[in-house]
């Protein structure tokens, strides 16, 4: 099966500019809505913990993506890797990084805004551990996945829950 993946990352234009995405959320929407007409399966990628994004902003990204009802979604935490422009920025002017506990809680909340028809293809990633600068907790994918499961069970939260209230 063919699937086209869209690297949206965030719905916030100031963030997209900072991470050199060379597109706005509005231009993404134009492309995405046009593409959806093709009927080809699609998947949207988002990143939590992007520089200067708040929890509210990350939840807003999930809400807006949820309204698009993509076929699939991949959610990642920001990875700062050696040899990248972002690493240089981080070394020169460190910014706050998302904690593992915050990531787990935010992902659980984000899932509430995603339709049950959207396949969750990934809820954490694990980049090259040899190149990872920060946050180091992202290297322990199993712990993150277990943390999300535990949080959801303890807080009676699940994919699509917020949509049931709308």
Task: Label each residue range with its predicted role.
Residues 1-2, 75-79:
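Short low-complexity stretches enriched in small and charged residues
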Residues 5, 43, 74, 119-121:
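Structural detector of well-ordered beta-strand residues that form the stable sheet scaffold
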Residues 8-10, 77-79, 124:
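Short, small-residue-rich loop/turn micro-motifs
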Residues 1-43, 47-68, 86-101:
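Conserved non-cysteine loop/helix-boundary elements of the Radical SAM core domain that shape
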């Amino acid at each position: 099966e063919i699937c086209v993946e869209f690297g949206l990352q965030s719905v916030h234009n100031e963030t997209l500019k900072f991470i050199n995405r060379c597109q706005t959320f509005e231009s993404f929407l134009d492309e995405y809505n046009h593409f959806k007409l093709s009927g080809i399966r699609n998947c949207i990628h988002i990143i939590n913990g992007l520089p200067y994004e708040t929890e509210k902003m990350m939840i807003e990204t999930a809400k807006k993506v949820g309204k698009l009802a993509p076929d699939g979604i991949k959610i990642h935490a920001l990875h700062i890797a050696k040899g990248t422009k972002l690493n240089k920025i981080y070394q020169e002017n460190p910014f706050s990084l998302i904690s593992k506990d915050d990531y787990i809680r935010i992902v659980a909340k984000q899932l509430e805004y995603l339709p049950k028809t959207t396949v969750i293809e990934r809820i954490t990633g694990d980049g090259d551990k040899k190149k990872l600068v920060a946050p180091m907790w992202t290297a322990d994918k199993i712990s993150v996945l277990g943390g999300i499961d535990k949080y959801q069970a303890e807080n009676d939260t699940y994919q699509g829950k917020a949509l049931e209230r709308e």
